[in-house]
């Protein structure tokens, strides 16, 4: 498969059909994205049940003879400042996904991006200084605004310039994830980065 370089239309980049020419497996992509989204949840929510809240364990009044409803504890969930019924506890939302499935989902996503012409390949994509205006002008020149930029190695200038832009993000190949890949209208990737992606997915 040949990909035309956007900044040099006379040059093409040869990539593997096995990696970038697959059918779109919607079920697999959905499963991997749900797993990824669940796994990044903190899961640190916590509440106190009736055994954990502070308060007396004494029975407020006797069981019978007062005319009032029977009560055994001031810490009951029915009472103000009592415990919480079915109190939330810290837990892990991690869902295991095999490496082969994860790689398969990434291959499927990249293949679909190419089919929909949403993957834009540049030989080089950099800015001279970490200035947001420079990045805005550069993206305006190539008519991209809702875009994920993927580089082979960390580019501090791009990262700093993109921090204050809506719907623009910069990631390295090692830090890209399936949710980011499908969250933007376009994915801009450098030729060195896509070669590294091919190495990782084969």
UniProtKB/Swiss-Prot annotation:
Gene Ontology molecular functions: rRNA binding; structural constituent of ribosome
Domain of life: Bacteria
Keyword Cytoplasm carried by entry: no
Pfam hit, one: Ribosomal_L4
Alphabetized UniProt keyword annotations: Ribonucleoprotein, Ribosomal protein, RNA-binding, rRNA-binding
SUPFAM superfamilies registered for this protein in UniProt: Ribosomal protein L4 (SSF52166)
GO cellular component: ribonucleoprotein complex; ribosome
A biological process term (GO) from this entry: translation
Family: Belongs to the universal ribosomal protein uL4 family.
Subunit architecture: Part of the 50S ribosomal subunit.
Protein's name according to its UniProt entry: Large ribosomal subunit protein uL4
Organism: Buchnera aphidicola subsp. Baizongia pistaciae (strain Bp)
Gene that produces this protein: rplD
